[in-house]
């Protein structure tokens, strides 16, 4: 494909998704004024979307109860580990390690815990490309699994105190290898970790100087690894006086973390990163203030900050609704969770990687850029191909067919309108434009050989056959197998579904 054509297609895709963000009927009350839509929004952002049963359950709750349910996940018994034990996985291999986490995201009853692990994985990044994976030898048959251990650290501390998280990640072997902390020696300090600690993890550009970085790097000297575990070597530590962010003393590495987190930019930086991950980009100062206040009054509790975020009116505003493009992981996991598909995730690491997100292997220290970067002509095609593979799965030993017939029977869906409205509610919050609805109804009523409209035509309501007389064939297996699968595909591949 010529570069100009490639770029034109990418722009067209991004424009279609942007248009979808504004496609709901603005003459009607905003979607987030309805409790059901609020809950669907909350479950997408604080998790990966929800099945019809879970959405019904949360709709019966008040907002406070729903947020409490998500935040206090430790009281929820989760049987994901027992499910994982039934699948043969060797987490020393990157593909199986990715499958292991994707399965946790798909089947966990604690979706916010997994979403927060994904947040920390993108902020406090480390990757297999440099950290490596365990390589047993006769001399060392059980080497430590640094990436898995870091991952479990994030899970244990997902909603903990920010200081505990930063202190822990500073000594984490995967992070030390990723940013060369183990080579930080007296007389020749390595500035990598000190720089990223301030720039990416805690303060942001403009809130520190190059001198602060150099002095902090001196404080981290003496840190190293021995047999894959953190060790402090006093003889390799610079014991001289350092001045960091205006404070002077004979500081060590842990002192640097505490000094940095006492800076007023630290709570604001974390508040902004949380807001942009869960709500929308470029928040106003008034959006961040409740989170900053929660940080200050609770000694840096991430749980308190998220409670402030998930109960903020701005989180349920028009600006927040469908304002983020789903990451590949959110897209894949969400579709599987919402349709109730049973899978061993064998093909999912390849799918998310081709879409631009290889878990445990971010592109660089800044993680994934996200936003519009998720959608190019190539990654859009991968999303469409995934949707097709998911809805046409026929029990291939890895992914079971979506239980579409069971859904129709359980919810007594026997008319074209009922079927379209059911899946529109499940996948698109019921925000199906009249043009899209008419196109979908016409598709259901057309013969089995009728072509599928394209996702973009679906949004525009331009598919041939729109407006035709609608008659539902008897709910024969062939109708479910062909037409209802196609309907699910069209909604999953639509520009609207790409938005979280």
Where does each model-flagged region fall?
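N-terminal secretory signal peptides and thylakoid transit peptides that target proteins
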Residues: 1-14
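A general structural motif at alpha-helix termini
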Residues: 10, 59-62, 71, 169, ...
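Flexible, low-complexity segments enriched for small/polar residues
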Residues: 30-35, 39-52, 263, 267-298, ...
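Alpha-helix C-capping/helix-to-loop hinge sites
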Residues: 46, 104-105, 123, 127, ...
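N-terminal accessory alpha/beta regions
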Residues: 52-157, 182-183, 444, 450-468
């Amino acid at each position: 494909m010529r570069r100009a054509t490639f770029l034109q297609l990418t722009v067209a895709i991004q424009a279609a998704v942007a248009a979808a963000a504004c496609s709901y009927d603005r003459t009607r009350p905003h979607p987030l004024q309805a409790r059901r839509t609020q809950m669907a929004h909350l479950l997408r952002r604080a998790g990966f979307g929800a099945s019809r049963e879970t959405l019904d359950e949360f709709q019966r709750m008040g907002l406070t109860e729903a947020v409490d349910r998500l935040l206090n996940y430790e009281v929820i018994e989760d049987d994901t580990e027992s499910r994982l034990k039934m699948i043969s996985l060797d987490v020393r291999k990157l593909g199986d390690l990715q499958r292991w986490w994707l399965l946790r995201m798909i089947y966990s009853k604690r979706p916010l815990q997994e979403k927060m692990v994904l947040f920390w994985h993108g902020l406090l990044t480390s990757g297999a490309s440099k950290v490596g994976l365990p390589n047993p030898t006769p001399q060392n048959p059980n080497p430590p699994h640094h990436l898995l251990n870091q991952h479990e650290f994030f899970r244990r501390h997902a909603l903990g105190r920010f200081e505990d998280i930063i202190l822990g990640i500073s000594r984490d072997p995967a992070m030390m290898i990723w940013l060369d902390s183990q080579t930080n020696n007296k007389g020749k300090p390595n500035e990598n970790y000190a720089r990223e600690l301030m720039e990416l993890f805690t303060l942001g550009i403009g809130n520190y100087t190059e001198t602060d970085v150099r002095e902090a790097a001196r404080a981290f000297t003496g840190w190293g690894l021995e047999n894959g575990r953190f060790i402090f070597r006093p003889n390799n530590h610079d014991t001289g006086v350092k001045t960091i962010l205006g404070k002077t003393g004979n500081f060590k590495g842990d002192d640097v973390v505490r000094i940095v987190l006492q800076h007023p930019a630290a709570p604001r930086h974390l508040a902004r990163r949380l807001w942009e991950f869960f709500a929308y980009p470029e928040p106003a100062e008034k959006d961040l203030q409740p989170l900053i206040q929660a940080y200050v009054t609770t000694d840096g509790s991430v749980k308190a900050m998220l409670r402030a975020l998930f109960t903020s009116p701005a989180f349920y505003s028009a600006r927040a609704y469908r304002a983020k493009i789903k990451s590949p992981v959110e897209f894949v996991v969400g579709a599987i969770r919402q349709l109730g598909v049973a899978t061993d995730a064998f093909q999912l690491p390849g799918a998310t990687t081709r879409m631009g997100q290889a878990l445990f292997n971010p592109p660089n220290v800044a993680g994934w850029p996200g936003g519009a970067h998720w959608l190019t002509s190539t990654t859009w095609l991968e999303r469409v191909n995934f949707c097709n593979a998911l809805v046409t799965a026929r029990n291939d030993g890895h992914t079971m067919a979506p239980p579409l017939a069971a859904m129709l029977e359980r919810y007594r869906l026997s008319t074209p309108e009922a079927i379209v409205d059911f899946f529109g509610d499940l996948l698109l919050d019921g925000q199906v434009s009249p043009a899209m609805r008419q196109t979908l109804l016409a598709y259901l009523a057309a013969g089995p050989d009728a072509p599928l409209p394209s996702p973009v035509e679906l949004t525009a309501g331009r598919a041939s056959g729109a407006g035709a007389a609608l008659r539902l064939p008897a709910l024969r297996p062939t109708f479910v197998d062909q037409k209802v699968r196609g309907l699910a595909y069209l909604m999953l591949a639509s520009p609207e579904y790409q938005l979280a």
